[in-house]
Amino acid sequence: MNRGYMGKILWVDLTAKEFREETVPGEIYEKYLSGTGLAAWLLSERIPAGADPLGPENVLGFVSGLLTGTGSLFTGRWMVVGKSPLTGGWGDANCGGTLSPAIKRCGFDGIFFTGVSEKPVYLLIDHGRPELRDAGHLWGKDTAETEEYLIAEAGGHARVAVIGPAGENLSLISGICNDRGRIAARSGLGAVMGSKRLKALVLNGKKRIPVYQRAEVQRLSRQCNKWVQLQPPFIPGPMAAYVGTLMRVLPTQMAMEGMVYKILLKKWGTVSMNQMSVEIGDAPVMNWKGSNVDWGIGKSLSVNPDAFKSREKVKYHCYSCPLGCGGVCTTKGPYGEVHKPEYESVMALGGLCMNGDLESIFTMNEMLNRAGMDTISAGGTLAFAMECYEQGILTREDLDGLDLTWGNAAAMITLVEKMIKREGVGDLLADGSRAAARKIGKGAEDYVMHAGGQELPMHDGRNDPGFNVHYSVEATPGRHTIGAQLYYEMFQLWKRVQGLPKPPLVYHKNRKYVANEEKAVMAAACSRFMNVANGAGLCMFGLFLGAARIPSFEWLNAATGWRKSPEEYMAIGAAIQTLKQRFNIKHGVDPLSFQAVDRVVGRPPQNRGANKGRTMDIEKMRSDYWRQCGWDPKTGRPEGEIAPSPPRPSP
């Protein structure tokens, strides 16, 4: 009997236009859960070594979470998986919205695509019946137009995942969109979808999702929701920056309590951290060479939390989320009502490029969402091009006449449009900064801020070394949604998992930069826990409530009927981590090549600002982490088998 999971996946052969359902044994869910765990098990053997990420041998998968649809909270995440054309290794992108339960209500835990369609198509699953339909009339349309059309055509109740022009044009920094602005952006998987000439998935199902103890799941959810709804008064948005200033100047630091971050998220969303992050040295500035000195409180005032709150027409909640950190905002630009930009997007298109023009940030964010292009990588690529222009590596002639100086919002908007269309210099930049630098030469690679080919997110590891560790060791490099010292403090896993260290409540800041076994244990615990979360479909923001308040492990047991301990679930997370690492080794990716670049780890250290004088011993931190994973501490290669290989699909 299936419990929590549907027990089946759907294979779609785009070349042959054939469908095949596959039953997944129950013991596989017990070993790897669902979500990216199930996907890692499936794709480990089914994508052959050397497969072209943009070729027919690559597999593109859409997976839901084991807890999605069971009545548990914060379980609306869906994931896209495949071999990444950006990094050459394991690729997955995680997204909110409303698609995740739609996958399961069609009767599947995942939908996987092989081959390449001769012409553009979209997949429609209507009450269990899969069908490939012509998408020629939709090719070239943006994600919002396409989604609106397909929902109307399906009767108004379907959920849609769709690529825009960036994915169609095989941009290596393109993603996959749903709900008009929630995007599975990282790893370049929009290009994989475009290479298969697959425009969209349209899902319309009503299958009941089985739950072992539905009443218990609901009881746990009610208990958890009491913590979510606590919302004491907080300071005005512009004052948050001064809290950051105080945190920066004090020699000591207090361990972060997730309930505080919950208050910020519930009131403002992720933009609550915009100015504060600049002040404490968390938000990178001027392509990672600047600091709060260059983009201080005065310059960043335009992106203070209340600037977004004042435009918010309605809050946006992902499926099963009581927090509602998203929003729909009104703008003065051409798009009218748009999704509120997230922190990552604001800072990538803002401080990273020294741009304080709020209206331009709204405009570029919506342009990129409609095109289906990653705002983090797009912002990182813009900042790279700006520094190349500053250094004389790119000239105004190279940039099609654009005066790409720091903070030139009009030039940024024009360049974003060119990148989306692959027009002029936009064609050079559409695949991200590393690919562009390799074509430019002339030392341009010195200004690419990446790990393993993926532009880095808006969290500076010189402030929190845990970010640099995870940027450098995850199977999907340059990732900020797995772990950091800050995350470990908020997860509070030591309250539920035996043997994990409890950080002190107050500690000297210098303690963060000491590479030792305790830091490695914390980092490995974050990886394992988030692998469990991504197998369950849990949102990281919900997990910040702390392990004693959000019943992740209890939800899993109640939904499935299992009786696993927190330690057993963490072991599952470790097994998933190793599967993904093995995938990279199989596909010729050297784990050493994922190390974040020198500037990002403080080589040389900055001479002013919040992160002045800080350098990470990233090699030791990485080696210590690999040792905690049971891998070779010098090479990052796993040793020994951890699971039987899944069978290859029948021809």
Task: Annotate each PLM feature.
Residues 1-94, 98-648:
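Intrinsically disordered, low-complexity segments enriched in small residues
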